[in-house]
UniProtKB/Swiss-Prot annotation:
Gene name for this UniProt entry: hldE
Molecular function via GO: ATP binding; heptose 7-phosphate kinase activity; heptose-1-phosphate adenylyltransferase activity; phosphotransferase activity, alcohol group as acceptor
GO terms under biological process: ADP-L-glycero-beta-D-manno-heptose biosynthetic process; lipopolysaccharide core region biosynthetic process
The name this protein goes by in its record: Bifunctional protein HldE
PROSITE patterns: PFKB_KINASES_1 (PS00583)
UniProt xrefs under PANTHER family: BIFUNCTIONAL PROTEIN HLDE
Ribokinase as annotated region, ranges: 1-318
Length: 476
């Protein structure tokens, strides 16, 4: 499966869970301490990153989604750092500040790419009033299409059953990264994402893929779950749902430097993709690709839609296919950053014929990437009149995406693609027919940005209208 990136700008996700601050101290190590047999690190720089549930929120924001987060913090300097950092990324924070507790903070000392020690500053949040979190959840639910409960067993999800019930009552799917060996509190969740160690701690040793599926189905039935996604390290991940075939996904990681936060990335991409309208199997494929990216980074990491697109589609010779506008803009920027020339054209392409294919092949030869923008059904009807289009938008785009000359296919609903072109800003805008370059929609914007506009001739004797008339007349 090669999934297509959704438009994450349409995804609203609420994250509730254990928030923490990850601190990193970096420096070289050149000697052993005379006080004890430990290395001496000369700290030269430091870094602070949101961790735990806050890293989940940061992942969603980095994809372009709308993240809201609820969690428990102290009233201290780490809480301030967390809030300011997340706000700068456009994450809406609604933390419960409890002065009697410290904000959970983890300090890692790093040298030469290796973690030497981790120091944890925390007290488990216990006995907090559940209404503090529930009321914040109620405020957020009307604005989201998915809920993530990120459980690190630090106390924020002490009343997880009530959170699941409230989300289900609002008909919002609940995705949970579980903790511990007791899954009873997660009863009724839409999906759990245990890693293999967490899964085996609950069901016992797994001996084969079939055994994993059988045990996963047992958990699904026992705890009334919608599905289980078991992340399996070098073996990828497996999605198990009742009454459906298991969906095995091989790992996409080329190199593994650090698994810190990989589970956060999986659940964030998964939930954001579902919130943006993707079916669960495609969302899992996207999450698997995302995990392959972040384990190749050091420390708690996020990824962009550009990195995710490249992980999915691989080399420049691989067609991207149908793509959402926001993802296309990111993909074009990535292509241009690598020195690739991006060509763009547009049309209705109602009944694809030899003239279209010849035109698109010629357009593709003018650069490294070809974008085809396609009028939606409503747009075609306004331009061509009643009875058009013959083929709906999704079919027209699917046919175009299957052509070797075409890299991306994107729909637009306006009468002209001027707005879309001004957002994408290709290096070369191409149009077929007898237009003057200055009259082509979007041409002025492309030229102003340093690009070019070119007119190509259509092949004589090929016309969609003629084909339709011939069919109506009973010929051919």
């Amino acid at each position: 499966m090669k999934p297509i990136l959704p438009d994450y700008n349409n995804a609203g996700v609420l994250i509730i869970g254990d928030v923490m601050l990850d601190r990193y101290w970096y420096g070289p190590t050149s000697r052993i301490s005379p006080e004890a047999p430990v290395p001496v690190v000369k700290v030269e720089n430091n870094e602070e990153r949101p961790g735990g549930a806050a890293n989940v929120a940061m992942n969603i924001a980095s994809l372009g989604g709308h993240a809201r987060i609820v969690g428990l913090t102290g009233m201290d300097e780490p809480a301030k750092v967390l809030t300011e950092t997340l706000n700068s990324l456009k994450v809406k924070c609604d933390f419960v500040a409890l002065p009697e507790y410290p904000t959970i903070t983890k300090l890692r000392v790093m040298s030469r790419g290796q973690q030497l020690i981790r120091l944890d500053f925390e007290d488990k949040f216990e006995g907090t009033d559940p209404e503090l979190v529930l009321t914040r959840m109620e405020r957020a639910l009307p604005h989201v299409q998915a809920v993530i409960l990120s459980d690190y067993a630090k106390g924020a999800l002490e009343h997880v059953e009530a959170l699941i019930a409230k989300a289900r009552a609002a008909n919002v799917p609940v995705f949970i990264d579980p903790k511990g060996t007791n899954f009873e509190p997660y009863r009724g969740a839409t999906l759990l994402t245990p890693n293999m160690s967490e899964f085996e701690a609950v069901v016992g040793k797994v001996t084969s893929d079939d055994d994993l599926v059988e045990k996963a189905l047992g958990l699904i039935e026992k705890f009334e779950l919608g599905a289980l996604l078991v992340t399996r390290s070098e073996h990828g991940m497996t999605l198990v749902r009742p009454d459906q075939k298991p969906f095995h996904l091989p790992t996409q990681a080329k190199e593994v430097y650090d698994v810190t936060g990989a589970g956060d990335t999986v659940i964030s991409v998964l939930a954001a993709s579902v919130a943006a309208g993707k079916p669960l199997d495609e969302a899992c494929a996207l999450a698997n690709a995302a995990a392959g990216v972040v384990v190749g980074k050091l420390g708690t990491s996020t990824l962009s839609t550009i990195e995710l697109a490249e992980a999915i589609h691989g080399s420049r010779d691989t067609d991207f296919g149908v793509i959402a506008e926001a993802a296309l803009i990111d993909a074009v920027k990535a292509a241009q950053a690598k020195g690739e020339k991006v060509v763009m054209t547009n049309g209705c392409f109602d009944i694809l014929h030899a003239g279209h294919v010849s035109y698109l092949n010629n357009a593709a030869k003018l650069g490294d990437r070809l974008i085809v923008a396609v009028n939606t059904d409503e747009s075609v009807k306004r331009l061509k009149g009643p009875g058009r289009p013959v083929n709906p938008t999704d079919r027209r785009m699917a046919v175009l995406a299957g052509l070797g000359a075409v890299d991306w296919v994107v729909p637009f609903s306006e009468d002209t693609p001027q707005r879309l072109i001004s957002e994408v800003l290709p290096d070369l805008l191409v149009k077929g027919g007898d237009y003057k370059p200055e009259d082509i929609a979007g041409g002025k914007e492309v030229i102003a940005a340093g690009g070019e506009v070119k007119v190509l001739n259509f092949e004589d004797g090929c016309s969609t209208t003629e084909i339709i008339d011939a069919i109506k007349g009973g010929r051919g």
